[in-house]
Amino acid sequence: MTDNVLKLSRKNIKKLIPYQSARRIGGEHGNILLNANESPVSIFFKLKKKPFNRYPECQPSKLISSYAHYVNLSCNQILATRGADEGIELLIKAFCEPGKDAIIYCPPTYDMYRINATIAGVEIKEIPTIKNTWQLDLLNIKLNLSRVKLIYICNPNNPTGNIFFKKDLIFLLNITLGQALVVIDEAYIEFSPEESMTNYLKDYPNLVVLRTLSKAFALAGIRCGFTLAKKEIIQTLSKVISPYPISIPVSDIAIRSLEKDYVQLMKNRVLDSNNNRIWLINQLKNITCVETVFESNANYVLVKFSMFEKVFETLWNKGIILRNQNEKMNLKKCIRISMGTRSESLRLIKELKIFSKKNMCQGEMSEK
């Protein structure tokens, strides 16, 4: 009977491997979680007493106006969503015809662009970034624009941590004008705010920017994000969003987080994270089992290790949970490390030094 039920599912879903989120693949036993690019510290809000027997506004007006003020845009340019992930999905729903249109995504990058397109039955054109520099392969993107409706760019890119050249993003916007939307996922932009593309929304009707409160705002648990675009795009997305995407508690917490004092606290946390990243990178460069530390503009660092599997497993068993990137395109032997507190980073470095000393003494460090 179960087999008969499973036959009812769509063919592409039967073959689909779901997104392997940090919580989905385990590691909850760990006491140092450096695998999901979350804030290592939490902020707390006292919820207002409100009745919950009525549905919320589809787009809570106070939330929209608060975020509009934060990003210096008009309210009609903003759609509140369940994390930036919902924005990724809505764009495909609203703009791509299954079996006809395509998206471009540029691995190694965030997998949800590809997964959402697969679920929707939309073709995926994979244009890898240039190896080692991780910059966009503009020539191949230009040659593959046929039938493309959406181009997803994560900036800063996850998991590599690099920023894409602004001139390349502008070039992309120009060559796709009237043909495709360029979607810049700025989930980590608060860590490099000068690189944001929001100022270009007034110049390019084909630009869409995705944002979230999950990272710098330390609110991954409430799932609140935003899509920023021309009002016509926002109106189109509003046709396909669920009736009540933002719950009353989520809206209340998000509004509080966007108040002046809390925004300043967020900026202070970002400064601490960026300083900790600089410190961690310098420390990692002196660890024997580390081959390469890639520069980063976000709250994580990509590191290439010798004996990477043994490094990952050893730290895992000690309760330090990192993110294995070995299966990602061009990221062999790489592990992504989220920024933790300074004490967590000190513990990580201590364990890596112990590991290196032990394995160097055993003559195993030459294994590549």
From Swiss-Prot:
Its cofactor is pyridoxal 5'-phosphate. One of its GO terms (biological process) is L-histidine biosynthetic process. InterPro entries: Aminotrans_II_pyridoxalP_BS (IPR001917), Aminotransferase_I/II_large (IPR004839), HisP_aminotrans (IPR005861), PyrdxlP-dep_Trfase (IPR015424), PyrdxlP-dep_Trfase_major (IPR015421), PyrdxlP-dep_Trfase_small (IPR015422). SUPFAM superfamilies: PLP-dependent transferases. It is an enzyme of class 2 (transferase). Its EC number is 2.6.1.9. The keyword Hydrolase does not apply. It catalyses: L-histidinol phosphate + 2-oxoglutarate = 3-(imidazol-4-yl)-2-oxopropyl phosphate + L-glutamate. PROSITE patterns: AA_TRANSFER_CLASS_2. The keyword Transferase applies. Pathway: Amino-acid biosynthesis; L-histidine biosynthesis; L-histidine from 5-phospho-alpha-D-ribose 1-diphosphate: step 7/9. One of its GO terms (molecular function) is pyridoxal phosphate binding. It comes from the Bacteria. Keywords: Amino-acid biosynthesis, Aminotransferase, Histidine biosynthesis, Pyridoxal phosphate, Transferase. The modification N6-(pyridoxal phosphate)lysine is found at residue 215. Pfam families: Aminotran_1_2 (PF00155). Homodimer. Belongs to the class-II pyridoxal-phosphate-dependent aminotransferase family. Histidinol-phosphate aminotransferase subfamily. PANTHER family: HISTIDINOL-PHOSPHATE AMINOTRANSFERASE, HISTIDINOL-PHOSPHATE AMINOTRANSFERASE-RELATED. This is Histidinol-phosphate aminotransferase. It comes from Buchnera aphidicola subsp. Acyrthosiphon pisum (strain Tuc7).
